[in-house]
Amino acid sequence: MKPSGLYIHIPFCTQKCRYCDFYSITQKAGFFPYHPNPQFIERLLQDVRSFKERYAIEAWETVYIGGGTPSLLHPGDIRTLAAGICEGQKQPVQEFTIEANPEDIHPEWLAACSEGGINRLSIGVQTFDNDVLAVNGRRGSKEKTITALNTIKSRWHGELSCDLIAGLTGQTAQSLSDDVQRLIDYRIEHISLYGLCSEEPLPDTREDFISELLRENTELLAENGYIRYEVSNFSYRDKHRSLHNQIYWNMEPYVGIGPAACGTLIHEDSGGKFIAAERFEGIKDIGKWMTAADRTSVYPCEHIDRNIFLEEVLLMGFRLSEGINRPAFARRFGADITAFIGNTLRLWEKRRQCRIGADRVYLTEEGLLFLNRFLIDALSELDTKAQCPAGKPLDLDG
């Protein structure tokens, strides 16, 4: 299999943030923040080697260590994990990212990342507002975040990305724009601005408020040289895009290792036509994940058929400002994208919210504001055509 992305999930946290639904554990199963945890690291590396061998993966093109809170790992564990991942690589990993909370940043930790070959930091700032941090269960502070950014700026020579969230409890329009402006003033290379996700439906007024926050701050970022290349991601002068995340959005293969880590391996013929896909997700039980002798049992596999894969290509691809590559789509699915959702594309093009180019189909800046509505229309048309377009069923599995 060609080079692939690798995602590593570190499930440890000191406390659970109120808005977070990622799998994590706090000080149990033998975990203590900043202490060595060699058994956990070795188990991760065993699974990395196993997947790489089983699927004949040539190399890791990108690596992303997320969580949870990877910055709670002991510096020695970071060195061991990074070295094990890079073992056998003929070329360095092109992009090697680790997530961190600002309050965990210190010189020794940064040195361990550099020595391990990690070349990109993703810092979960979320907000500089101390009141908003407190009400949302974050353990950091404005002062600690500023100290962390100053430390990184003086000691880190790789890429830097920072996350902010729009719609946090207690947040105002002014506090978010102040947060965005502060990152701009630091000239952070890459900024992610996410709308708050909630398991429970938000009131329409709250949804509208979050949408307006995103619109206003997207404009602020654009005015300061940040190019929006994905609905929630901005690259300064378009030189600092996340290579790993583009694997997700372009529906390319990646492996997920660790409890709750998800990965998708895609099988195509020599011409790029989709054959099958397998999705693995680590079990959400750190105890069983650590002790199971049969490693296939902790990464149950789901087979993704062509219909579902096509839907996912649409869901992910239209998040990108460049949209979906038409020739690549046609190679994968045996027909141009207009054969599947042509009516939706033409309708949205008439509204000037979509562009149908020779090589790409994409939403305009205005269209991206209504991404969810567009996807509902597109999937509805896809479902209709799968049932009976032009008087006969469309063979999506052919």
PLM ranges: what are they?
Residues 1-7, 14-15:
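Flexible, acidic/Gly-rich N-terminal and inter-domain linker regions that tether
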Residues 2-3, 24-54, 58-335, 391-398:
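C-terminal scaffold of the Radical SAM
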Residues 8-10, 125:
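Alpha/beta-hydrolase
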Residues 11-24:
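Local cysteine-cluster metal-coordination motifs and their immediate loop/turn environment
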Residues 335-347:
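Short amphipathic alpha-helical interaction segments
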Residues 349-359:
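A short, conserved structural fragment
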Residues 360-364:
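Minor-groove-contacting beta-hairpin "wing" of winged helix-turn-helix DNA-binding domains
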Residues 366-398:
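Short, amphipathic alpha-helical interaction segments positioned at domain boundaries
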